[in-house]
A protein has these predicted regions:
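Assembly/oligomerization interface modules of large self-assembling protein complexes
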Residues: 1-4
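Structured, hydrophobic secondary-structure cores that serve as assembly/anchoring elements
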Residues: 6-20, 74-110
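Alpha-helical scaffold segments that mediate packing/assembly in large oligomeric complexes
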Residues: 12-84, 202-235
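Short, surface-exposed helix-loop/turn micro-motifs enriched in polar/charged residues
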Residues: 25, 89-90, 153-155
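A sequence-level detector of short, solvent-exposed, charge-rich linear segments
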Residues: 44, 48, 52, 56, ...
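Sequence/fold signature of self-assembling virion shell proteins
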Residues: 65-69, 103-236
């Protein structure tokens, strides 16, 4: 997958007025790039997991026709793994979904740590990641919210190690401008699934990665795949 950061434009003279070295401005931009890269990788992995898992009926507990997200529904989703349900070690959900579970008087809401807007908590004895990834909410009739319950190594993101950055200063405008832009790539693998190059292509878009039919299940059993999903009516 290919991604990019920027362009970020600033006037070199601004750093002089602010009495800040140019290196400090580059450091701030670099930190912002690192955060955006991690966010892109996280959201892409979640979108691919939602697509692959929800394309397998045996891995989904869809109660959206009659109900919203509940503790019982989540437990029934775990049951899709049968005697291997203990292998489901992590849950991923949006913030609104998390607060619905809190509102249902779940007592084990211990927060383990927080990184930016991503919270990691404990629900049902499993580590739960709370992040507003777009793929965890789907528009429709009704709108649906999704909780992923995942095994260790459900998704593997690897850096392409081909980050290309360019800083360029240009004349010709009212003020001299410096532009910073960065390109990058990364790879993604899902446990128990393989990417269908014929269907999705060698350089997929976000939409293609989020299409379930582009992920082929290779594991002989759902128990040997990335995990399961609970789908509920977002309005309930």
């Amino acid at each position: 997958m290919a991604g990019g950061f920027g362009p970020i434009r600033y006037e070199p003279s601004q750093m002089t007025w602010l009495e800040r070295p140019t290196a400090q401005g580059i450091e701030v931009a670099s930190r912002a790039f690192a955060e955006i890269l991690l966010k892109d990788q996280l959201n892409t992995a979640i979108a691919a997991l939602v697509a692959a898992i929800t394309a397998q009926a045996a891995a989904v507990n869809d109660v959206s026709a009659t109900a919203g997200i509940t503790y019982a529904g989540l437990n029934n989703a775990h049951a899709k793994f049968g005697d291997a349900s203990q292998n489901l070690v992590t849950q991923v959900m949006q913030g609104t979904t998390y607060h619905k579970l809190v509102g249902q008087n779940l007592a084990n809401q211990q927060q383990l740590f927080q990184a930016g807007n991503v919270r990691v908590i404990d629900i049902l004895g499993k580590v739960s990641v709370v992040t507003d990834a777009p793929a965890l909410m789907q528009d429709g009739t009704p709108d649906k919210e999704i909780i992923l319950s995942l095994v260790q190594g459900a998704a593997l993101v690897h850096d392409g190690r081909d980050i290309i950055s360019n800083v360029q200063t240009n004349n010709g405008k009212e003020r001299i401008e410096t532009t910073l832009q960065t390109d990058y790539t990364f790879g993604l693998g899902l446990k128990g699934y393989t990417w269908d190059v014929t269907a999705g292509g060698k350089s997929p878009t976000d939409a293609e990665l989020a299409t379930g039919t582009n992920w082929d299940k290779t594991a002989t059993s759902i128990k040997h795949t990335a995990g399961v999903a609970l789908i509920g009516d977002a309005s309930k």
